[in-house]
Amino acid sequence: MEEELKCPVCGSLFREPIILPCSHNVCLPCARTIAVQTPDGEQHLPPPLLLSRGAAAAATPPDQDAAAGATSGGAGANTAGGLGGGATGGGDHADKLSLYSETDSGYGSYTPSLKSPNGVRVLPMVPAPPGSSAAAARGAACSSLCSSSSSITCPQCHRSASLDHRGLRGFQRNRLLEGIVQRYQQGRGVVPGAAAAPAVAICQLCDRTPPEPAATLCEQCDVLYCATCQLKCHPSRGPFAKHRLVQPPPPPTPPEATPAVTGTSTASSAGGCRSPGGAGASAPRKFPTCPEHEMENYSMYCVSCRSPVCYMCLEEGRHSKHEVKPLGATWKQHKAQLSQALNGVSDKAKEAKEFLVQLKNILQQIQENGLDYEACLVAQCDALVDALTRQKAKLLTKVTKEREHKLKMVWDQINHCTLKLRQSTGLMEYCLEVIKEDDPSGFLQISDALIKRVQTSQEQWVKGALEPKVSAEFDLTLDSEPLLQAIHQLDFVQMKLPPVPLLQLEKCCTRNNSVTLAWRTPPFTHSPAEGYILELDDGDGGQFREVYVGKETLCTIDGLHFNSTYNARVKAFNSSGVGPYSKTVVLQTSDVAWFTFDPNSGHRDIILSNDNQTATCSSYDDRVVLGTAAFSKGVHYWELHVDRYDNHPDPAFGVARASVVKDMMLGKDDKAWAMYVDNNRSWFMHCNSHTNRTEGGVCKGATVGVLLDLNKHTLTFFINGQQQGPTAFSHVDGVFMPALSLNRNVQVTLHTGLEVPTNLGRPKLSGN
């Protein structure tokens, strides 16, 4: 709170604060210091005025703008006499500044200067000319100032306000702030060795040491006078005739826990002003009076001027035509508004405290994370150094092995060549000795064998025998440039794991036995995703498996089980790794199967119409067409209506694998399980094996039903609602697709999406 109690000009606690038109506060002595003359009057301002105003700012007691002795501090008594018995002294004339404003609003603008504190122009202390007295200087200043105009600039918002004929007395005194400052000073405790508060109130204008006890208190000036100073500084005539002089109040006894504060005395002596009752003591609270009608108390509040007024101001003053409200009601209303505003500020202050706690936690986390990252960096670099050391050892081992291998090869070749050379040299020397002999018969006895030996020895020195088997150069080249580049490029990657993808439920849907999922990356993410991984369970609550990996954010999965519940989830990945999973979405496939004939898998002679629900053939041979659905679990039922039946053909109905042979009747290979039927009877067929002939055939308008129960692994056929023979096939397992074979004499229409009928008839007995 102390910052709120300091003057923006002097930086000390407020002394006699006044309220400027902009609602900011400033000390009265400081206000005298920063009050400046307008350009019109400033050029005629004599230098002695500056000295007079500087002295007044340093030593003027409270509310003594009209007192002649109040302009010179402790020497006020003598100065008042020097100025004569005028209505006001030099200080009063200094405060009576004429009107000046840049606009009619009473406010002006001012650009702060680097040479002025707080953007306020402070008048320098210019010495008086030689040979002139202070009284003469003040007199000259007063006479000059009466004909000049002045203004004051707020040190906080830098708005200028012109002063009327009352000068600074025209600004209201902030007694509330003054009382808060006094209580704050008293509550700060006593400095050891401080003097105790005086037992009686003392005069605030005495230049004697010690000051005389106060005899009177002026309610309008709020100043304590002794008898002598009252006669000199506050005579009961002129402008002081209407002032009310009362007995000074007794000084309050300070509590033992919080005695008088030395700081208050220091501030008072430094500023040249003391509170009534002496240092460290505050006068009892009294109601402020109107500055224009000094005998009247405030009773109303002017809404237009936003200031309290008395009833005289309403009757004859400038507030007579203004909107006014009762002072007490307005006081309570403004208190309520202030309390409400304080609640908002309190909430913001609470948020700010929590935010500061959060910032301090962030500081601690930064310290901890910094240490962790440093340790991690050291560990990673040490691991790289260790890996490089191990690789260095491996490479050195390879070089050593290569060197030893080359040395061994060379030594082996040296030994072999040395042996051959010794043998050849010995043979050569022996042959030379034989040639030297002169015995022909002896020579011829061994010449043939010797010639063969020499030839054999010569053949041993084949081509390449005198060439080194290995080179002195090593065929090992270490390319360290990529590793050096990688080391130079080793740096921190400003990327983290991607965030959790958000599933867009409004775009997720199921259709038949396929599901479509959509997702997106959260907004304002700083870790973009390079791709996504979509996982789906098996429809029975089993483990998840990846069904899609890519950059798209929309995926459709076909070929799922009907009447099944699937759980799906997605996660993102980037170069830093794989992010967390999204929330799991539950998808329910269709209860019954909806499908048509598949034009892509059917034989080219098959003719489809009616949105691929009606099939016929252009050939007299049987051709196969499959459905678009595939079943591996559940119970499924569909019907085929015979639209045309000519010349007693044998259409076949059933199920098949996707790889079934399509240019012959259904059931002749091991990829199909079927019932073929004519107009009189039917047979079951698989792997070209005909079984269970049953009476009863089909004709135009007949309906053939197929029931595939993969829970019981059975296949059953029906004609016109009656089961045709026993259960056709058992132990069927795997993935099956609806299938049909027919020729040009038959046309059938497929009906799907049917519930399993509960009123199917009993089976017909088979003929065989």
From Swiss-Prot:
Disordered as annotated region, ranges: 55-74, 247-284
GO molecular function annotation: zinc ion binding
Keyword Zinc-finger carried by entry: yes
GO CC, one annotated term: cytoskeleton
Record PROSITE patterns: B302_SPRY, COS, FN3, ZF_BBOX, ZF_RING_1
Domain Fibronectin type-III: 498-592
RING-type zinc finger segments: 7-42
Keyword Repeat carried by entry: yes
Compositional bias annotation for Pro residues: 247-257
Coiled coil regions in record: 332-369
Binding site for Zn(2+): 290, 293, 313, 319
Residue span, B30.2/SPRY domain: 574-765
Comp. bias regions, Low complexity: 55-70
Chain ranges of zinc fingers (B box-type): 201-248, 285-327
Domain COS: 435-493
Superkingdom classification of source: Eukaryota
Subcellular location: Cytoplasm; Cytoplasm, Cytoskeleton
GO biological process, one term: positive regulation of neuron projection development
Primary site of residence: cytoplasm
Keywords on record: Coiled coil, Cytoplasm, Cytoskeleton, Metal-binding, Repeat, Zinc, Zinc-finger
Name recorded for this polypeptide: Tripartite motif-containing protein 67
Taxonomic lineage of the native organism: Eukaryota, Metazoa, Chordata, Craniata, Vertebrata
Name of the gene: Trim67
